[in-house]
Swiss-Prot record:
<dbReference type="GO" id="GO:0045292">
    <property type="term" value="P:mRNA cis splicing, via spliceosome"/>
</dbReference>
<feature type="region of interest" description="Disordered">
    <location>
        <begin position="1"/>
        <end position="34"/>
    </location>
</feature>
<dbReference type="InterPro" id="IPR027417">
    <property type="entry name" value="P-loop_NTPase"/>
</dbReference>
<keyword id="KW-0539">Nucleus</keyword>
<feature type="compositionally biased region" description="Basic and acidic residues">
    <location>
        <begin position="1"/>
        <end position="12"/>
    </location>
</feature>
<dbReference type="Pfam" id="PF04408">
    <property type="entry name" value="HA2_N"/>
</dbReference>
<dbReference type="GO" id="GO:0005684">
    <property type="term" value="C:U2-type spliceosomal complex"/>
</dbReference>
<feature type="domain" description="Helicase ATP-binding">
    <location>
        <begin position="85"/>
        <end position="250"/>
    </location>
</feature>
<dbReference type="GO" id="GO:0071014">
    <property type="term" value="C:post-mRNA release spliceosomal complex"/>
</dbReference>
<dbReference type="GO" id="GO:0000390">
    <property type="term" value="P:spliceosomal complex disassembly"/>
</dbReference>
<keyword id="KW-0507">mRNA processing</keyword>
<dbReference type="GO" id="GO:0003723">
    <property type="term" value="F:RNA binding"/>
</dbReference>
<dbReference type="InterPro" id="IPR001650">
    <property type="entry name" value="Helicase_C-like"/>
</dbReference>
<protein>
    <recommendedName>
        <fullName>Probable pre-mRNA-splicing factor ATP-dependent RNA helicase prp43</fullName>
        <ecNumber>3.6.4.13</ecNumber>
    </recommendedName>
</protein>
<dbReference type="InterPro" id="IPR011709">
    <property type="entry name" value="DEAD-box_helicase_OB_fold"/>
</dbReference>
<dbReference type="InterPro" id="IPR044756">
    <property type="entry name" value="DHX15_DEXHc"/>
</dbReference>
<dbReference type="InterPro" id="IPR002464">
    <property type="entry name" value="DNA/RNA_helicase_DEAH_CS"/>
</dbReference>
Amino acid sequence: MEPAQKKLRQESKNPYLAHLNNGDDSEEVVSSKGLTRRATTVAQAAKAEEGPNNFFNDKPFSQNYFKILETRRELPVYQQREEFLKIYHENQIIVFVGETGSGKTTQIPQFVLYDELPHLTNTQIACTQPRRVAAMSVAKRVADEMDVDLGEEVGYNIRFEDCSGPNTLLKYMTDGMLLREAMTDHMLSRYSCIILDEAHERTLATDILMGLMKRLATRRPDLKIIVMSATLDAKKFQKYFFDAPLLAVPGRTYPVEIYYTQEPERDYLEAALRTVLQIHVEEGPGDILVFLTGEEEIEDACRKITLEADDLVREGAAGPLKVYPLYGSLPPNQQQRIFEPTPEDTKSGYGRKVVISTNIAETSLTIDGIVYVVDPGFSKQKIYNPRIRVESLLVSPISKASAQQRAGRAGRTRPGKCFRLYTEEAFRKELIEQTYPEILRSNLSSTVLELKKLGIDDLVHFDYMDPPAPETMMRALEELNYLNCLDDNGDLTPLGRKASEFPLDPNLAVMLIRSPEFYCSNEVLSLTALLSVPNVFVRPNSARKLADEMRQQFTHPDGDHLTLLNVYHAYKSGEGTADWCWNHFLSHRALISADNVRKQLRRTMERQEVELISTPFDDKNYYVNIRRALVSGFFMQVAKKSANGKNYVTMKDNQVVSLHPSCGLSVTPEWVVYNEFVLTTKSFIRNVTAIRPEWLIELAPNYYDLDDFDNNKEVKSALQKVYQMAARSKKNARR
């Protein structure tokens, strides 16, 4: 940094903190290169970008930087930089619409950097993303574009991973992480500009952030807010944000031919694989993007396509084909492989790459070279039914808006083709116009806890863009009251305050905070980490029997939670190499991730003064204590064996469920606690552990009040017996 810049940084008042110290925020901030804060011109910014030294750290630019700069200046958004700066200078809030591929996610934050001069005012620019993958991937790209180290001037912050530091000026972060930051700093005072990207996705966290930004705009007139969307339906955003001005930038799009199937496909996965191989053999050059619904489906498709493509290459029937998966829990280094060059053409045919992705590739990431899109028309969506208190990820038809976004991926570099694996009639008549906002289809317990921590007590009149159903809100308040996170007046309790500090669902947080009462907080910490990462068990189609046999080595007869602990203890006892995991059909990646999550949660426990203790392993109550701790957080997720002995019935909600096929219980206990309710062809409960019914009335007497079970005589009768037994035990203890 130049001496003049250092001096300015030390001497200038921070205009962003004027609302805290009543300082004069009219002081002009000027860089040593003549750029004036919030008055920078395109010519000045372009000159600063051209060096010879980096504007933000004064280091010489690399040769690669100038090549990337040329590419950046060809992006559609760059052509409207001047128009953007004019609107940005004149308004506090802007709604910005840029189609995917326009460059908005990478360029707009950089335009803002050269105008805000955060390195002179000790502030930062935040750019939120709905997905972890996008936050990491875009931060890496922008760090390369700015010729800085990732984690220095440009960083990212996602749940359980903070890659930023004291020098960070631009931070890409998940919307959930900015929301967590607002819980400790209601004014978000470190930021001079907050950019909410991919707002059209309407995630729960983005919707709450929009409400907060609206409140903050009046309290912090110095704060600039940009709401960015990839869809042209921006009027709703404009109206919500005080009729904010709109700037729209077209993407670089070529015409895309849409093909539909003649008849509905019975197996969309098989149809997708068939279509990919057909494109590879018969169509002209260009890469392929396939949309599937989740990790298991994607990995399975990658294996099958690779095997088939290798056969085609050996037979000389097609050119080389590289297949890459893309989904949220994929490690960053593997995510980046989607940007690797396409294989070279051969005499047998064109070289291609195939990216098989979840809906993250709809708008969050742009992959150059895609000419063909295969769209089966499905995605996994969170669905919540407040009446039966069940939240589940369901494979559901996408919306028309999503279908259009997917098709648009094919026309980025040349005319493309989109193969929709459904009929045109289904597109017109069966697909809804827009995906429902997440706030209308989610359990709101975590959100209510966050809003309470943010100091928002009137949840009903909070300015939601789309207000949630009153029943959903009441269910959330009721659940938090039963967990003792909210008192009867709806105010945060000491336990609720602690729970809000953990980046966990309330029931997991409560279980962790209460675990010292059962002398097993070390074990519950490990278990919480394991429940916060993808499945540690690997069960490939080609070796299911062997994988199941290996799992038996770790299986605990009393339940899946204890089985998970056995896996973790074996992993940590020095066994946990990548080879050991491979041989035991365990995900090395998930176990490493669980280890990192555990470290982060442990730090939070230390800050919140939650004691770390264990029952000695040889104590007969070692596993009993862990099971009791499970009940302390998950007493609302309990099921009792039904009268016929074949199924289970959930408490209060009377849902008939079966144990998931992955369940490792050696017998079917009378009472179980479960982590997940899974809806597929029928209702399953997953991650199940046996419990004793007397623990329910001991640890959650308010929830297990007999008067609340009038609609389920079978369960009420069983609970009455438990109460009678408890009363007899108490009476005998007094003698």
